[in-house]
Each structure stands twice: as structure tokens, then as C-alpha cells.
Amino acid sequence: MSFESTFEGLCEKFRILKQQLSAPETLGTQAFVVASREYSDLLPIMSLIEKYKSTQKEIAELEELVNSASTDPELRSLAKDESHIKQKLLPKLRHELQLSLLPKDRDDSRNAILEIRAGTGGEEAALFVGNLYRMYLKYAERKNWKVETINISTTGIGGYKEASFSIGGKDVFARLKFESGVHRVQRVPETESSGRLHTSAATVAVLPEVEEVDLKIDEKDLRIDVYRSSGPGGQSVNTTDSAVRITHIPTGIVVIQQDEKSQHKNKSKALKVLRARLYNLEKQKREEEISKMRKSQIGSGDRSERIRTYNFLQSRITDHRINLTSYRLDYVMKEGDLDEFIDALVADDQANKLKQITH
């Protein structure tokens, strides 16, 4: 389908929706609600189409003036200049229109749950989890996003076996979803006397946060165990059975929550994580059925499956998916200045989607 015919089809759809919304018999019905939502979604696209078409019309009228033998020389010169300006604007408008037609990820407006886990590399990998955790906290702070800790599992000497937390705010999942995958670190550990460079890894999973109304979980599918929470080394933290382990029997997914002193709060947080994981599982199945272009697996934590490498010796960060390298590692890690990478990943994703709809 050509570029122009796509827009003609959208204009026709917009006209039909307008008719449906003005029909008295649809008022107050579910059909009215659906049509109203579709109409609102199309409004900004229709505005761009109108601008694109009017620019095309203006160019045609200006070219007619330029090519007319009766046009005054001074007016012809002005018309030629104006036509040149409008022709330069047209590709930009066309690109904006193409972007507006890209398939939307319905989860982009959701909040996110991040789960960072140590991969290969022992204690050094656990320390790197802490680096990534603090980096994302700083990034959230820069964006004025709200962070809530879900589960922190430390190693006792400054490292983290796991750090999971939710982030809420504008465009959270839309921007952070590209962080899913294996992050590799190359540096000399403080305990390394020979100064030898070590390579370790951590996995990052970014899940869309799901409300209870979006995903119902049957109580019959859950096994809920309660026990006393424990800290590093296994010592008891609470004298009451406040820790909660929820097993989703059909999938085998297990969520453990013990950060809160209240059993009720731990259960609530565990269910939030379980909903996100189940939703993500269903989403992955849908994506695999529709297209093999993108998969959301984060890998096993093996160093070879990396999406990004952090080389502390060279102060270098390289994102291997888009071949982008920055030598501002210290600032990125300590200040959470991730926009250079995330903006580039968003642009790359848009470019790939454009190829899909234009070929």
C-alpha cells in the first residue's frame, strides 16, 4: 500500500467515526466509547495529514506561478524561494506522518518493574548489580519518577544478589523497556592484587506493571507459604511469619517477598510482581505468534549474550545493539544520564518499524 493511499484510508475511517459519534442511537453505548477513543487517537494524525496536503497544494500553486509566462519576474523569484522552503518542509512532514502510523506498544504508558540479578562473575557481578541499581535510581530522579523498593537481596559485603523495584511516572515503560537484557562489566576488582581485568555480568528485566483489573489471577492457582524473613547469612530478621512465598501452580513462577514487616504488605507486593511476570509471559507469547522480529528474553546471564558493556578502565560504555559508544561512564553510572542511549534506542526501534510498514 502506498503512502498516499494509507492516508486516504485513514481519512475515510475518520469520516465514518465522525458519523458514528453524531448518530443519536450510539450515544451512551459501548460502540460510542470505542468510536470516541479511536476518534481521539486519529485526531493528531488527521492534523498532520491536513498540514501535509495543504503544503503539497501550496507547492503546486507556487510552481504554477513560477512556470507561468505571465508572472512578474519579481513575483516569480519570490514564488520560487517560497516553493523551495515548502519542498524542504515536505519530507519532514512525511517522516512525522510515518512515525504517527507506527504500531503502538500498548504497554508504553504503563509503569515498570525492574529486576536486576547477578549473572556470571561471583561477588564482582553482585557489586555490579548495585552499580546498575543506583544508576536507575538516579535516572528515575532525573525524570521525576517515583521509585518503590520491592525486594533487595544483599551479599553482606556491599553486593546485591538481586534488586527489584517499581518505577512510576510519564513514559516509564516506553523508555526503560530497552534496558532488558544482559549488561556486562569489565574492570579490575579492588581485591585483585595483580591488576587483572575481570568480566562479569548482570541481567536486567523490565516488566510492564499491571493493575489487578488488567489481569485476574485465580486464587485456586496460587500456593501461598508464609515464614520468618531472614537477612544476610540466614539470621532471623523478624519474630513473626511475615515473609511470603507465592507459587503460581500453572506456570511454576515463584515470587518471594520479605522486605516489609507486615505479611499483608509482603503479599501485596508479591502479587504485584506475579501479575507483571504473568502479563509479560502472555505478552511474549503474543509477540512470538505475531512476529519474530523482537523477543523479550533477557538471557541466562552469560557474558556472551550482552546488550551493553561497561568498561571502567577506559571509562567506556558500548551498546552493542546500535553500536553506540560513550566515554562518559562515570557520569552515566553516578548521575544516571542514560538519555543518550535510550534516545538512540528509541530512534532505532522507530526506524526498524518504519522499514516494516514501508517495505
Curated annotation (Swiss-Prot):
The family database entries (Pfam families) matched by this protein are listed as: PCRF, RF-1
- Cellular localisation: Cytoplasm
The record's Gene Ontology cellular component field reads: cytoplasm
Q: Which Cys pairs are S-S linked?
A: none
Q: Which residues carry this modification: N5-methylglutamine?
A: 235
Major location category of this protein: cytoplasm
Post-translational changes noted in the entry: Methylated by PrmC. Methylation increases the termination efficiency of RF1.
Q: Which InterPro entries is this protein grouped with?
A: PCRF, Pep_chain_release_fac_I, Pep_chain_release_fac_I_sf, Prokaryotic/Mito_RF, RF-1
Q: Which Gene3D superfamilies match?
A: 3.30.160.20, 3.30.70.1660, 6.10.140.1950
| Keywords in alphabetical order | Cytoplasm, Methylation, Protein biosynthesis
Highest taxon, organism lineage = Bacteria
GO molecular function ontology, one term from the record: translation release factor activity, codon specific
Q: Entry's PANTHER family?
A: LD18447P (PTHR43804:SF7)
Q: Which family does it belong to?
A: Belongs to the prokaryotic/mitochondrial release factor family.
Briefly, what is this protein's role?
Answer: Peptide chain release factor 1 directs the termination of translation in response to the peptide chain termination codons UAG and UAA.
This protein's name: Peptide chain release factor 1
Supply the source organism for this entry.
Anaplasma phagocytophilum (strain HZ)
The taxonomy runs: Bacteria, Pseudomonadati, Pseudomonadota, Alphaproteobacteria, Rickettsiales
Identify the coding gene: prfA
